[in-house]
Amino acid sequence: MKKLLMIGVLALTMGQASAQRCLPKMQGIEVCGAFVDGKPLSAAFSGGVVLSTYTKNGSKWVFGGEYLQRDYNYSDTTIPVAQFTAEGGYYKQLLTDASKTLFVYGGVSALAGYESVNWGKTLLSDGATLQDRDAFIYGGALTLNIEVYLSDRLALMGNVWERCLWGNDTGHFHTQYGVGLKLIIN
């Protein structure tokens, strides 16, 4: 009996247990906000929601939607350019620590959506006419994503994206950097 008790105590006290994170088919909901093109939040911002599903090697598939708005100064007013995009992509796990608390991913995504220039109004208050029009947009994004787990089900994220979109008249490249929260749902 003494021997069995000693084996039990050793089994419970030896080694270090770490959380079960990034297991295959585990899913999380990510909510992110970001600065766009180095502009202040009052002039350019984005926000999005993403569903991520982990694969057997710790990488993840992501599917979600995003809203991006950038205001362009014109005379004494601003002209808003808004993009509504859907994203689907794959993020490869590049680095993790032994305790599975910190993860670094590099990813590539396909994007498709719609861009609205001045909410469809082509005539400005001073009588000028906008040449840029609303359009369907498509393209891709490169992403660097860092996750730090605060608990087994909650992670703080940092992201840097470079989006390249075609089909619009207002610029093809947008750099975004932001933060977000991830909640593991299963």
Where are the regions a protein language model picked out?
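Predominantly the C-terminal beta-signal and adjacent terminal strand-loop region
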Residues: 68-70, 145-186
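Outer-envelope beta-barrel architecture signal
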Residues: 20-29, 57-61, 100-106, 134-136, ...
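Gram-negative (and chloroplast) outer-membrane scaffold detector with strong preference
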Residues: 52-125, 183-186
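Residues that define the transmembrane beta-barrel architecture of outer-membrane proteins
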Residues: 25-27, 41-47, 78-86, 102, ...
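Membrane-embedded beta-strand positions of outer-membrane beta-barrel proteins
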Residues: 27-33, 47, 61-65, 88, ...
